[in-house]
Amino acid sequence: LTEIPLFEEEFLLIRHINDANKPVPNNKELTNMKLLLLEEGHCLRSQTLSFCKVTSVPKNIMEGTALTTLVQMVSSGIGVTLIPEIAVPFETRSAKVSISKFLQQKPKRAIGLVWRKSNPLLRQFNEIAVLLKNLNKTSI
C-alpha cells in the first residue's frame, strides 16, 4: 500500500447548549461524564477512548450508530461526545449543542490517502493528495 499523510484533524467536544459556559474538561474529567461513543469497532470510538487514556470501556458510556445520533443524544441532554472537526458544521447545524476545543491536550487524528501500489491511477492519486494538502492549508 502507498500512503500519503494529508493533515491532522482535531476532535471537538460536543455538549448540551446549557453547558456552553462551563470549563472544558480534560481527558480525565471526561471519563467521569456520560460519554457517548460510536459502537464497538469504529475507529472514532477507539480514538476517543485512547484520548481519555482508559484501558477498558467505562461503565457510564452510551453508544450510537452514527455521529448524527450522538449529536442528537447530546442535544437531548443525555451526555457529551467528541466528533472530528471536519464533521462539526454538518452534524451540528440544527442541534442545540455547544462546541468546544480542548485547551491543553488536544485529541486529534492523522488523515491520509491510501491506495494499492498496483493501482493504475497512481498519478491521479498523487495529484489528489497535493490538492487536498493545499486545500487544508488554505482552510486553516
Short names for language-model regions:
Residues 7-10, 17, 39, 65, ...:
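Residues at the C-termini of beta-strands that transition into short coil/loop
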Residues 21-25, 33-55, 121-129, 136-139:
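Secondary-structure junction motif
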